[in-house]
Amino acid sequence: MSPSNKGTVLALILALTMVVVNGFSSRFFVEKSSLTVLNSWEMGAKHDAAIANFGLPKYGGFMIGSVVYAGQDAYGCNSFNKTFNTKSPYPKILLIDRGVCNFALKIWNGQQSGAAAVLLADNIVEPLITMDTPQDEDPDFIDKVKIPSALILRSFGDSLKKALKRGEEVILKMDWSESIPNPDERVEYELWANTNDECGVHCDKQIDFIKNFKGMAQILEKGGYTLFRPHYISWVCPKELLLSKQCRTQCINQGRYCALDTKQEFEDGYNGKDVVYENLRQLCVHKVAKEKNTSWVWWDYVTDFNIRCSMKEKKYSRECAETIVESLGLSLEKIKKCIGDPDADVENEVLKAEEAFQLGQENRGIVTIFPTLMINNAQYRGKLERTAVLKAICSGFKERTEPSICLNSDIETNECLIENGGCWQDKRSNVTACKDTFRGRVCECPVVDGVQYKGDGYTSCKPYGPARCSMNNGDCWSETRKGLTFSSCSDSETSGCRCPLGFLGDGLKCEDIDECKEKSACKCDGCKCKNNWGGYECKCSNNSIYMKEEDTCIERRSGSRSRGLFTIVVLTAIAGISLGAYIFYKYHLQSYMDSEIVSIMSQYIPLDSQSINQDSFK
């Protein structure tokens, strides 16, 4: 390529930098995890660590490990050819110094030595920075890095080395549980991408990720658990280069929105203008689909486009794209209207909004490379892989609001399966206060079959409310003997246990009261008392009847006198009813019938003054 072409390309690259510098609120963010010293010289002290942009950070989780220093191989630029042993039962966290070789190689060598995680100690005094992969190369081992790693400040690294040199054991907790903000029950995330499929390894990784993550993304979006937005990086052509061949082939709308041709073949094949045009179309596909409340269709479109309209197969065209749009039932006219005229000297509202997002805001960093994933305004760090990204998204839900897909055993450990998570449980009723969450577990008294349990969730949970006795008898005493059951739980009371009548105790344990022995009942003269479980029997002498409520005996009368008295009462009642019926007929019913007869006869026989004295009919 000629020197003039090189200068033009350099100017285009620097254009973004100029925009970034001029953006008042734009800045780069370092995504961090937390380190806590669990023993040794500064127990409980917390430190920040910068998450590496490769490997697999444990988003939403944590790990505890014993720190080991690499010693004479401190830089870790060559294979250690050994494993680092410690007396601690915890996994090994290898401490390596920064310098000499790239970050990723150090972490790879640490993983090969058996380390569960790697800490890189900075070798200069500076704020934390993000460890990234080499830009001019992409070694094969990058995708094989599976462990988490982080950069720490030089001062903290020096403190760790001194403690280890003194022979102290250093136990650290590496915590990613708050690395992704988790404010509510919906996660908002965005993917900064590019439609160019001939830009090398980065493009291939992006295409593979979209294809593999599509199913999960659509489940989350359809369920209303997430809000997804696609974004595309664009550049600005400097005004002095607007008429150059480079700007004309890489930009639309008179140099306002450009996509660099990484091959720098400005006259052959596809160029940046084609790419930024398709970027805009994909943004419009999402916009139109969202208006139909089917925003997840974007994943179908992009997946199909990568398969059917590939640059490598010379099918990257407007016609191919529009065929996919129509096959998905989207309005082609609305999408064309959204795209507008790419040759017009006007701003495009969709791409203008993209520039604002790209420059970042006060609470989020600037985006300069693709693919970049943002989750709740935090930049995702690590390998762009389906399960790893799902873990990061799941860590963005407020605890106990995550969807079931986040509690799959493939991506999280159910802590309730190990010693019930340290929470209260009732094995008899199979009720537990342990609730599995993506970031761990919570101990919270449950609601079972409409019955609310109350307590601290760790050592105690008791059923509460009207139906509490249906759950393990409300944790109250209950016993059955010879088919007879007594309980100290009452549905009329919302809490507490009270021994029933005939028993004495605290409600958790009740003992039968011997009323006969204590002479609390059957105290009448000549009575004989017999104690039963939960009660007693009392018999009177001389064939008398025992009245329990009064605790007394009454004389039983002879059968003949009783029958005679009963007969007299019945006959008297019958006579009274007959007399009442006769009086009713005589004075009320007869009067009513007389008036009815007068009314009927008046319709057929003329009567004096249209009335007849009722007495004349009596």
From Swiss-Prot:
GO terms for molecular function: calcium ion binding. One of its GO terms (cellular component) is clathrin-coated vesicle membrane. The chain crosses the membrane at residues 564-584. Residues 58-164 form the PA domain. CDD domains: EGF_CA. It comes from the Eukaryota. SUPFAM superfamilies: PA domain. The keyword Transmembrane helix applies. Residues 585-618 are cytoplasmic. Residues 412-462, 465-511, 512-554 form the EGF-like domain. It is a single-pass type I membrane protein. Pfam families: PA (PF02225), VSR_TRX (PF25011). Glycans are attached at residues 81, 293, 430, 542. GO terms for biological process: protein transport. Residues 24-563 are lumenal. Expressed in seedlings, roots, leaves, flowers and siliques. Residues 1-23 form the signal peptide. Belongs to the VSR (BP-80) family. The tyrosine-based internalization signal may be involved in trafficking at the TGN. Vacuolar-sorting receptor (VSR) involved in clathrin-coated vesicles sorting from Golgi apparatus to vacuoles. PANTHER family: PROTEASE-ASSOCIATED DOMAIN-CONTAINING PROTEIN, VACUOLAR-SORTING RECEPTOR 6-LIKE. This is Vacuolar-sorting receptor 5. The lineage of its organism: Eukaryota, Viridiplantae, Streptophyta, Embryophyta, Tracheophyta.
